[in-house]
Amino acid sequence: FRSVGGIRRTLKRDNIRLFHGLSNELPLTIHRVREVKSVVTVHDLIFLRLSHCFSLVDRLIYNYKCRYACKHADHIIAVSECTKRDIIHYYGIPADKISVIYQGCSSLYACRVGKDKRKEVMRSYRLPERYILSVGTIEERKNALAIVKALEYLPDELHFVLVGRPTAYIHQLKEFMTKAGLQDRVHFLHGIPSDDLPAIYQSAETFVYPSVYEGFGIPILEALHSGIPVVAATDSCLEEAGGEHSLYVS
C-alpha cells in the first residue's frame, strides 16, 4: 500500500507505458491512469487454498490486493496451470486473460560441482554420507513431518537433511524425532550461501518435496538440474515442475 498518488505521479512523469506487478499486486487505482497498461504476476493463492495457515488480517489484506490486481490488470501471468485454475475459480477471471509462464532456477545447479568442493561443503556442514534432501521454509504446509516419519522404514544409514528457514513447526518435527529416536538422522540447515547449495543438492541421494500446496516449486527444478531423482506430492503444481521423469505420491 505505497502512496497511490506518488506512484501515479511517477508513472506520468517518467512516461511509463507498462507497469508490471511482480508478486500478486498492483498499485491501487492504477486502472485510473488510462495511458498505462498493467500486467501482474500471480505466484499462488495459498492464502485462499490453505486459509488456516494465515491470520485473518493477513488473509484479508492478501485477498484484497490480489483480487484488485487480477480484476484491473490488462493481463495476468500465472506461474503454473495450477495457479491459473485458482485465479479462475476464486476470482472469476476469464481464462484468455491469463498466460502461464513457468519459472526457472539459477544456472549454478546445472554445473557439476567438483568432488573436492562437495567434500568441503559436506565437511563444513557436517553432512552425513547418505541423505535425502528437502529445501524450503520449515513450515506445516511443506509437510516435512512426512519425510521424518518415513525414516523409520528406511535403512539407518540414510539420513534426512532439511534446508530452510525454521518456524514454530520445527518443534513438531523435533518432538516426533525424540519419540521415534531419530534425532541423529535429521539435520537442519538454514542461512546457506547460494554457492554451497548446488553441492548439497548434488551430494544427496534423492530430493523429496511432499508440500501440500505450492504455486510452482522451484526447488524441484534445482534438484532436477542437479541430476538427482525427485519425489514430490500430487494435487497442486508439483507435477508441472517435475514433469514425467519424477515420482509422485499422494
What residues fall within each predicted segment?
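Carbohydrate transferase catalytic cores enriched for Leloir-type hexosyltransferases
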Residues: 1-250
